[in-house]
């Protein structure tokens, strides 16, 4: 089962890299977003206590996405990951940033419109 999850994650990273290629103005890539959040996968599927490594990853990702294009790219990558990785619980995904003390102006979901999110919507 672990190998299946790892393979899906690798495939998702590769797919995100291809999708993100046209977004040259964004410094962050889908590969970076997905690999940073890999420690959160177990929580996103099963819940329970959020691992410290997961919250560190969420905070690190939030700090890495400094510009509006970066934040829109990260949002799109999160949306794609949500839709591509089986077994992710919507409530766990939507509530993860807040559980880690990160304030996002949206909840991670399969229907989010990432183009509407700009840097000014974020509270630092």
UniProtKB/Swiss-Prot annotation:
<keyword id="KW-0020">Allergen</keyword>
<dbReference type="InterPro" id="IPR036312">
    <property type="entry name" value="Bifun_inhib/LTP/seed_sf"/>
</dbReference>
<feature type="disulfide bond">
    <location>
        <begin position="40"/>
        <end position="54"/>
    </location>
</feature>
<dbReference type="Pfam" id="PF00234">
    <property type="entry name" value="Tryp_alpha_amyl"/>
</dbReference>
<keyword id="KW-0389">IgE-binding protein</keyword>
<comment type="similarity">
    <text>Belongs to the plant LTP family.</text>
</comment>
<feature type="disulfide bond">
    <location>
        <begin position="75"/>
        <end position="114"/>
    </location>
</feature>
<dbReference type="GO" id="GO:0008289">
    <property type="term" value="F:lipid binding"/>
</dbReference>
<feature type="signal peptide">
    <location>
        <begin position="1"/>
        <end position="26"/>
    </location>
</feature>
<comment type="function">
    <text>Plant non-specific lipid-transfer proteins transfer phospholipids as well as galactolipids across membranes. May play a role in wax or cutin deposition in the cell walls of expanding epidermal cells and certain secretory tissues.</text>
</comment>
<dbReference type="InterPro" id="IPR000528">
    <property type="entry name" value="Plant_nsLTP"/>
</dbReference>
<protein>
    <recommendedName>
        <fullName>Non-specific lipid-transfer protein</fullName>
    </recommendedName>
</protein>
<dbReference type="GO" id="GO:0006869">
    <property type="term" value="P:lipid transport"/>
</dbReference>
<feature type="disulfide bond">
    <location>
        <begin position="30"/>
        <end position="77"/>
    </location>
</feature>
<keyword id="KW-0446">Lipid-binding</keyword>
<dbReference type="GO" id="GO:0019863">
    <property type="term" value="F:IgE binding"/>
</dbReference>
<keyword id="KW-0732">Signal</keyword>
<feature type="disulfide bond">
    <location>
        <begin position="55"/>
        <end position="100"/>
    </location>
</feature>
<keyword id="KW-0813">Transport</keyword>
<keyword id="KW-1015">Disulfide bond</keyword>
<dbReference type="InterPro" id="IPR016140">
    <property type="entry name" value="Bifunc_inhib/LTP/seed_store"/>
</dbReference>
């Amino acid at each position: 089962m672990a190998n299946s999850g790892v393979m899906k994650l690798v495939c998702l990273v590769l797919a995100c890299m291809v999708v993100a290629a046209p977004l040259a103005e964004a410094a962050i890539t889908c590969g970076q977003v997905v690999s940073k959040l890999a420690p959160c996968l177990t929580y996103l599927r099963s819940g329970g206590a959020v691992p410290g490594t997961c919250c560190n990853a969420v905070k690190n990702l939030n700090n890495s996405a400094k510009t509006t294009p970066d934040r829109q790219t990260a949002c799109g990558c999160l949306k794609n990951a949500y839709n591509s990785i089986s077994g992710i619980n919507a409530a766990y995904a939507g509530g993860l940033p807040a559980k880690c003390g990160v304030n996002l102006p949206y909840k991670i979901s399969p229907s989010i419109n990432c183009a509407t999110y700009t840097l000014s919507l974020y509270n630092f």
